[in-house]
């Protein structure tokens, strides 16, 4: 099994190009089921993308892959979909597999999807997915670990209020509603840029969607959608991760290929800590200026601070000049990186959904183990900050969400190798 060897202590200097957003491309790939052909560009080279390709092919899709140096193009032909079951063997690898449920159900009137897998960071129940589809008229039962869904005729657009903000359920609801009969109005929706990107793709396909980027989305169902081409937006989580990498290594890095407005909440939090962050043409520049203040943080649905960057921010706070309180409001059990950071000399105490981080002068290298995707990269950031050697095990998580991570960091001076 591969591992990463990191020799820290070098400030990162240079520029990093950001890849396409994983959390946007996966639902957009699922949206291909709604039409006959979808051409997607700026597709990142990630194992989760490969898993979604395998899933779509299992349903009967034909996928042409055009490989470029830094991205894929995908041409997904779904006119011959003939299998409506998403098997456990594929779905267990990735929670995003559940996003085929809405498209299969709304277009074909039936779908059978295994209960999903993915990172081990909490229950992340599918109740809201099921509730909104039932409100559209679907009949749904859970049997033997599968969601069995069917409808008599077309789904019908409801007025539906999500009990809590759910990115995943918002996506499934939108994917189902674009072909449902009548008007769907969804309240308390996720507002994430990746949801906006999905909606923009669907509009390119001919969907009628209003309220994009707000908590109230209105969709007028169409009889069918068109073939289309669409470029996926850049990954704000990847961008934020490298912004924190620049800060924790006392570096100076230009993050390129990202719209500043979708990373502005990250930039503002870094500025609070004393890091210099300025917008540049097609990106942002992050520069350490000699101090790192302790800052409290709460994760919240967008435009709040992303839970997917909580672990990276915690790594930064381990070296701050004071005490910070980090509150995780999205997922339970998302502090699994804490024991590993403590192995490296961090002073962190977890109390329920809160972590108290007391800054130390320096972390030290150690052998550590990744528990999930975002935890793994937080340990890399910690390793880069030390003046010694860190060995990171179970790095297969990284390839689910970060393209060419070692290469991008090495190009900025990091000593990091996969062995």
UniProtKB/Swiss-Prot annotation:
CDD domains for the chain: UdpNAET
UniProt keyword list: Cell cycle, Cell division, Cell shape, Cell wall biogenesis/degradation, Cytoplasm, Peptidoglycan synthesis, Pyruvate, Transferase
Subcellular location: Cytoplasm
Domain of life: Bacteria
Pathway: Cell wall biogenesis; peptidoglycan biosynthesis
Cellular component GO terms held in the UniProt record: cytoplasm
Pfam families for this protein: EPSP_synthase
Residues the record marks as active site: 119
One Gene Ontology molecular-function label: UDP-N-acetylglucosamine 1-carboxyvinyltransferase activity
Principal cellular location given in the protein's record: cytoplasm
Broad EC category: transferase
Family: Belongs to the EPSP synthase family. MurA subfamily.
Summary of the function given for this chain in its UniProt record: Cell wall formation. Adds enolpyruvyl to UDP-N-acetylglucosamine.
Name this protein carries in UniProt: UDP-N-acetylglucosamine 1-carboxyvinyltransferase
């Amino acid at each position: 099994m591969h591992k990463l060897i990191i020799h820290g202590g070098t400030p990162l200097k240079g520029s990093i190009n950001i890849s396409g957003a994983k959390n946007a491309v996966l639902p957009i790939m699922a949206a291909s089921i709604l039409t006959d052909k979808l051409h997607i560009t700026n597709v990142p080279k990630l194992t989760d993308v490969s898993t979604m390709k395998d899933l779509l092919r299992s349903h009967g899709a034909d996928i042409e892959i055009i490989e470029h140096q830094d991205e894929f193009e995908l041409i997904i032909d779904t006119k011959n979909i003939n299998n409506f079951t998403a098997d456990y063997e594929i779905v267990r690898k990735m929670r995003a597999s559940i996003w085929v449920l809405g498209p299969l159900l709304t277009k074909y009137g039936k779908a059978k999807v295994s209960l999903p897998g993915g990172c081990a960071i909490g229950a992340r129940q599918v109740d809201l997915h099921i509730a909104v589809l039932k409100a559209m008229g679907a009949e749904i039962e859970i049997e033997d670990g599968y969601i069995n869904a069917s409808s008599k005729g077309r789904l019908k657009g409801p007025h539906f209020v999500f009990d809590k903000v759910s990115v995943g359920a918002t996506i499934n609801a939108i994917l189902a509603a674009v072909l449902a009969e009548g008007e769907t109005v969804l309240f308390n929706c996720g507002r994430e840029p990746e949801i906006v990107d999905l909606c923009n793709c669907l509009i390119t396909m001919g969907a009628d969607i209003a309220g994009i980027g707000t908590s109230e989305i209105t969709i007028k169902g169409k009889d069918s959608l068109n073939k289309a081409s669409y470029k996926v937006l850049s990954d704000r989580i990847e961008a934020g991760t490298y912004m924190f990498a620049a800060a924790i290594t006392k570096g100076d890095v230009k993050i390129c290929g990202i719209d500043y407005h979708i990373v502005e909440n990250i930039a503002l939090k870094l500025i609070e800590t004393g890091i210099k962050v300025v917008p540049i043409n097609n990106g942002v520049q992050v520069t350490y200026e000699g101090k790192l203040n302790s800052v409290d943080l709460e994760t919240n649905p967008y435009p709040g601070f992303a839970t997917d960057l909580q672990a990276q921010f915690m790594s930064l706070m381990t070296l701050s000049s004071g005490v910070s309180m980090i509150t995780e409001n999205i997922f339970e059990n998302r502090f699994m990186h804490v024991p590993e950071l403590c192995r490296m000399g961090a002073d962190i105490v977890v109390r329920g959904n809160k972590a108290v981080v007391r800054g130390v002068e320096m972390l030290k290298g150690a052998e550590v183990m990744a528990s999930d995707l975002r935890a793994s990269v937080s340990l890399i950031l910690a390793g880069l900050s030390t003046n010694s050697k860190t060995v990171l095990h179970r790095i297969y998580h990284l390839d689910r969400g970060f393209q060419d991570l070692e290469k991008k960091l090495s190009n900025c001076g990091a000593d990091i190798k996969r062995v």
